[in-house]
Amino acid sequence: MMQPSIKPADEHSAGDIIARIGSLTRMLRDSLRELGLDQAIAEAAEAIPDARDRLYYVVQMTAQAAERALNSVEASQPHQDQMEKSAKALTQRWDDWFADPIDLADARELVTDTRKFLADVPAHTSFTNAQLLEIMMAQDFQDLTGQVIKRMMDVIQEIERQLLMVLLENIPEQESRPKRENQSLLNGPQVDTSKAGVVASQDQVDDLLDSLGF
């Protein structure tokens, strides 16, 4: 027994589909022009390469700061290790002397070594302080990168706002797709789709896109 042939859900020919896509594209372009959004979208598109360059700048500045900090730590480590080793050795020698006092000649040598250690400490600490200052100065990139990131966030928000305005103005309510069955969105904020630019939070953006089937 032959199985009945299954007709495709969309009976439009390829030519009809292409014609409809072309018509929708023309309608979208005309609507953008009428709303004055074409220039805004163009500016947003031009901002994308600029944002990419800014991201690269942030990466460079962060990498340079990390390298400066690591170099300072590596330079300071031998000085700290030397002071620690010398201090432990002198402490052990003094403990031994107090437990069993040695001859005056040996005691004089211990005192001389201790004085030498104390005389060397300022040089080690001065070098370490200079490296700590270098680490602190390396963090100045945060001011610059913070400004760059803020600018990028503004660009992204503007692109999102313009795209939402296009959706709101060009998708009739009766043609919007059914909402996805997602209970977490049923109690979300209500959005007045009769006005452009009224979306106030990311949750509202998600709800709006969900209601449109995107």
UniProtKB/Swiss-Prot annotation:
The EC number(s) this enzyme carries: 3.1.3.-
GO biological process terms held by the UniProt record: archaeal or bacterial-type flagellum-dependent cell motility; chemotaxis; regulation of chemotaxis
Family: Belongs to the CheZ family.
Bilayer-crossing regions: none
Main location: cytoplasm
Disulphide-bridged cysteine pairs: none
Record text on subunit structure and interactions: Homodimer.
Region (Disordered): 174-199
PANTHER family: PROTEIN PHOSPHATASE CHEZ
The organism's taxonomic lineage, starting at the top: Bacteria, Pseudomonadati, Pseudomonadota, Gammaproteobacteria, Enterobacterales
Protein name: Protein phosphatase CheZ
Comp. bias (Polar residues): 183-193
